[in-house]
């Protein structure tokens, strides 16, 4: 057989200079600052270097004289910081240069431009503000409450230009590809609150029980876009003031119980063309589209949860220890494309097709007593008829397939037993313990089989729920 031989070489470098200063006064006041200068050959020589700094301060309030005699307060600290970090990974090794590909022109070898030069691109910068208070109360309760604002600006993207800027052949006998160019576009903000509580509920000689919970509330917002113009991308519409995780899609009104047809909110500007195409339905004085080509897109919620976090428990009795960990997420929507693909009727292949059992709920006939003017003619939770020829319209991408992303996962259960040291003295061992545990004991979601943990942007992509793992262990100390 013929074997291929290839080689590659690249000329790229990154340099960093770092300075840091720390100051501590009387274990009460702490100050830290840093400055770094980063250089990368990925950028043009005029924009090669970026300067980034950070500063942080904390105040150990418990050390102050006015708090030292407060018995129920064991610790209290206030801290705040601001920092900048540069990123150059959004651009290729030679992204600021015009790149060429080898092709042919009239049967002769030729170099064809593939991307335009980008001498003006610069470092992408992430600026983070963090403010928090933490402490311990009654020698039992630890707490931490923090606010953060992480803002990324001058985001680096490879932008595909219009054909008027030029093109190049991608594959023979196919349409040409647009030229690309790297650009700094947009500013995105991620801000929110982090809360953590941890309590020693029981703490005596035999019994000890620690219980903890933490929660993160996150808001994402697009602060700035090039020229303030929206960017429509699939089922998202990147728009200033909105989140990059917000869904922007067609609204599924329900199923017409007289015909079994899916109904969508009509775009008023497309009413005439919808009527000409036979895709307009008027029910009780309201117009609907029966195909998304004539429907109106609108905001349909976010893939981001309202709150997410974990719950932990550590219980011990003499030589026994039982530890549990749960993770949770509340709010947010997942586009269940896997479920959608199992609900659409298509031509069967040699081995047939797979369908979800819910397809058995498809509309089959006009319900008894239903008329053209019935107030409940539209079933908002209905399943349209199974129709091979109209499946693409009946089961089109819309908010019908958005489902709750909320979940609760029993992440870890671990039981261990340590043999008494008095039993081990005669055999020369310092310690011996046995452990048994289960990971991913169960997952609770809105739809069986859905794995909303898979993706933060709300996709599903036929991913399995995380596998359950059993483990056993033996620890020996000599």
Give short role names for the model-derived ranges.
Residues 1, 7-244, 393, 397-478:
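Extracellular/periplasmic, surface-exposed regions of secreted and cell-surface proteins
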Residues 40, 331-428, 432:
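Extracytoplasmic gating/loop element in the C-terminal half of outer-membrane beta-barrel translocons
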Residues 158, 226-228, 326-342:
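Short acidic alpha-helical/loop segments enriched in Asp/Glu that coordinate divalent cations
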Residues 200-303, 334, 343-378:
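Conserved small-residue
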Residues 294-295, 307-308, 320, 393-399:
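Short, flexible active-site loops
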Residues 302-337:
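Glycine-rich, aromatic-lined ligand/substrate-binding cores of catalytic
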